[in-house]
A protein has these predicted regions:
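Extracellular/lumenal and peripheral-membrane lipid-interaction modules
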Residues: 5-172
Length: 172
């Protein structure tokens, strides 16, 4: 019986659900950099999340980025493995979880000789990702979803980040 009671006091969103939602952001594309010096068209793919595992209250994202780079050295294609970290924040008005304070914590680029150019572009990539995720929710509660999800949208008091999940409590 306890499980039934628990259902009414909170709603849990798993990493898998966040990942399915993030898949909708696959192919985030943006032009970044300093035109004429070093700039790139970047496309993000394969975003996956780890919730509260590496660092309490943070979401770690990993993903791939395809880059078409132009620099003083000419045009070049490169691929990156990205690791991002963000703070999940609940927006009650929108009934959505946003990933704020997004930052690139690790980036490896292939071919390796592009690493220097990538270091130049990293602050621009950071800013572009931060702006994007400040506006695009990582997860939106649906009123037409499950009963728990509809209740979460109405009664949510905030969020708690636990390893592997985000819990939305309905009570203080």
């Amino acid at each position: 019986m306890l499980v039934g009671c628990n259902q009414l006091t909170q709603y849990t969103i798993t990493e898998q659900e966040i990942n399915q939602s993030l898949a909708k952001h696959n192919n985030f594309s943006k032009d970044i950099g300093l035109p004429g010096v070093a700039d790139a068209h970047i496309v993000l793919t394969n975003l996956t999340s780890q919730i509260g595992r590496e660092e309490p209250n943070k979401v770690t994202l990993t993903g791939d980025a395809n880059l078409d780079m132009n620099s003083l050295f000419g045009s070049q294609k490169a691929t990156m493995k990205l690791k991002l970290k963000a703070l999940p924040v609940f927006d009650k008005e929108k009934g959505a979880i946003f990933l704020k304070e997004m930052e690139v914590v690790d980036a490896t680029v292939q071919p390796e000789k592009m690493q220097t150019v990538m270091q130049t572009l990293l602050p621009y990539l950071n800013q572009a990702l931060r702006n994007y995720f400040n506006q695009q929710p990582a997860y939106v509660l649906r009123e037409d979803g499950s009963q728990g999800e509809a209740m979460a949208k109405k009664l949510a008091k905030g969020i708690e980040v636990k390893p592997g999940e985000i819990v939305i409590p309905f009570t203080d």
